Structure formats: structure tokens, C-alpha cells
Regions:
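A general structural signal for short secondary-structure junctions and capping/turn motifs
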Residues: 106-110, 211-212, 238-239
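C-terminal accessory module of base-excision DNA glycosylases/AP lyases that mediates lesion recognition
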Residues: 2-93, 99, 176-203, 221, ...
């Protein structure tokens, strides 16, 4: 299971070259999910969800460019973008992912070192910590623990997504112990399962979690998909991804509007439409991009629908 994500049963497509992957998707397609976002768009009319999807992409990218160029806020006339928090259109522009990619880049030519660095980075996922550490710090577990606990701004790790315990050889490893003590000793296990995945992120995630037994394996998923930045020959950027509970309501709207059979087909269609709706796009969208941008569109239209409010952590504050 990836972050409690809903898997769809995708029949008669070419993605089922891997029987393990098929069995995984089929098993989770039948699981009843308790999705807190399921009804967030109920009653809201979205005339053209495809056009709205690409509007969000272009407007959010324009905001990022203006902000990085030092222009004064609000950077947009859209009141929802002025008040709400959103990720960037391209995930490599978000500060967390940017820190992960910069931290791991020096070892991109060594697959074992890259896997170690990425697993540590996604278990940490804290920009300020990753920006201060070096890859050589990962080689000494006791020294690394001291660095994280006593010499870094606290908290040393981010709560952007939950990181639950890892189980290995009868021992439960909490977040700190997993990324400092365990991972350096199981690189061959991680490498073997990633190579056995046939470049598929879901297959690799599930192979690893058969042993880890994490109740929420989203950190594994994020780590494996990040491999595609550096080694697309190992994990394909075009690898199909499961539908997250946050993305499901908007992907449902897109699927219905496009009259397609499932989210996988919907994501493929959205990728094919980007040249029509955004000819100047700086790079090709991938399945994971479309999935998470659909989640951001669900957030955007939840504000419009009054099911999400501009308060607390949802409220954008200019100088943060």
C-alpha cells in the first residue's frame, strides 16, 4: 500500500508485463477506502476540468517565476492563489525535492551510493538538514545521529508526510534508527529489489515493503520515484502510479470529462494534451506529475467549494 493510496484494476493495457504488479493493483482495487477528500468537490460545477488543470499549471508556474525574480506580491490576480498554499507545477522546484536532488547529485554515477543517499534524504526530508549535511556524513551512523539530534536545527526531519517504523529481521526501526543504522547495511537488498522491478515504481515499492512491513509506505514510493531523476534506465519516469486519495476527486472529474475507463488512461491522455493546452511547457509531464497536480487542483477547487478554508497551515503568508 502506498500512503493509503487507492489502486485501480487496469485491464487490457500494456502495463501488466509484471505479474506481481498486476496482483498488487488488483488486490488494492477491491479495498474499501475511507477517503476524507472524496466529497470535497461535490456540488461544484467545473465546466472544463482539462482546461482548469492546465490553467492551474500555468498560473502556478508564473507565480513561481515572478517570485524567484524578486517581483513584489501578490504575483497573481487569482484570489485563491493569493491566499492558499500550493506546491509548484514542477516538483523539482519545491524546496524539499530541490534539497533532496542537490544532496544526492554527487553520487548519481554510483547506483548503490545513490540509493543510500535517496533513502536517507526521503526519510529526513528536511531542507535545512539536507543543506547542511554532506554525503560523507552518512558513513558513520553514531556520528550522524549526533549531528541530527544535537547539531541541526530541530526538528531534524520534516512532517510533510508520515514516516512509520521499518521492520527488519525481527527488529522495529524508528525513523532515526532506520535512516542512520539500518539503511547502510541493507543497500544490496534495496538494490536487488529495485532492479527486479522492471523499472516500475509500484512494483519496487511493494517488493521492498514486503520485508519492511511499513503501514504507510509512501516514503519508499517517493524514494523510488526519485531514482528516475538520476537513473531513468533503472526506474522509468513514465512508470504508472497509483491514485492518491487527495488526487482521486479531481482525477474522477477528468476521467468523466474525457470519457475514459480509468485513471491510468486519464493520466496518459492528460500528458498527450499538454502540447495543445500549454505549448511552451518547459518539460514533458510524467504520470507522477499529473497525479500530484490533480491533488493540487482538488485543493484549489476545494477552496472554491468552501470545503477547504484559508486558515492555519492552509493560509499562505507572503514572507514564509
Amino acid at each position: 500500500m502506498v500512503n493509503g493510496l487507492q489502486y485501480e484494476k487496469l485491464e487490457n493495457t500494456d502495463i501488466f508485463y509484471n505479474r506481481f504488479f498486476f496482483a498488487t493493483l488488483q488486490r488494492y482495487s477491491n479495498k474499501i477506502m475511507n477517503n476524507p477528500y472524496e466529497k470535497t468537490l461535490d456540488g461544484l460545477i467545473i465546466d472544463d476540468p482539462v482546461k482548469s488543470f492546465f490553467y492551474w499549471c500555468k498560473e502556478r508556474e508564473n507565480i513561481r517565476i515572478k517570485r524567484e525574480n524578486g517581483e513584489k506580491p501578490p504575483w497573481t490576480s487569482d484570489p485563491i492563489f493569493q491566499q492558499g498554499r500550493f506546491l509548484n507545477t514542477f516538483r523539482e522546484d519545491d524546496k524539499g525535492s530541490k534539497a533532496v536532488l542537490q544532496f544526492c547529485d554527487p553520487v548519481k554515477s554510483s547506483l548503490k551510493e545513490l540509493i543510500h543517499a535517496l533513502f536517507f534524504a526521503r526519510w529526513c526530508n528536511q531542507q535545512t538538514t539536507l543543506n547542511r549535511l554532506t554525503l560523507s556524513d552518512l558513513k558513520n551512523p553514531s556520528s550522524l545521529k549526533d549531528l541530527l539530534l544535537n547539531q541541526m536545527d530541530q526538528p531534524w526531519s520534516s512532517e510533510a508526510y508520515p514516516v512509520v517504523p521499518v521492520h527488519w529481521d525481527g527488529i522495529k526501526y524508528e525513523r532515526l534508527e532506520a535512516c542512520t543504522e539500518l539503511f547502510p547495511n541493507i543497500i544490496n537488498f534495496l538494490l536487488d529489489n529495485i532492479l527486479a522491478s522492471n523499472r516500475n515504481v509500484v512494483t519496487a515499492t511493494n517488493l521492498i515493503n514486503q520485508t519492511f512491513q511499513m503501514t504507510n509506505d509512501f516514503p519508499i514510493f517517493m524514494t523510488v520515484i526519485d531514482i528516475s531523476w538520476f537513473r531513468p534506465d533503472i526506474i522509468s519516469p513514465e512508470s504508472p502510479v497509483p491514485t492518491g486519495i487527495g488526487a482521486k476527486p479531481y482525477l474522477d472529474r477528468l476521467q468523466n470529462h474525457l470519457d475514459l475507463e480509468n485513471h491510468h488512461a486519464t493520466i496518459k491522455k492528460m500528458i498527450s494534451l499538454q502540447g495543445e493546452y500549454w505549448p511552451s511547457i518547459r518539460r514533458q509531464l510524467t504520470p507522477v506529475d499529473v497525479e500530484y497536480i490533480s491533488c493540487e487542483n482538488r485543493k484549489y477547487f476545494s477552496y472554491k467549494n468552501g470545503t477547504k478554508l484559508f486558515e492555519g497551515k492552509n493560509l499562505f503568508i507572503t514572507n514564509e
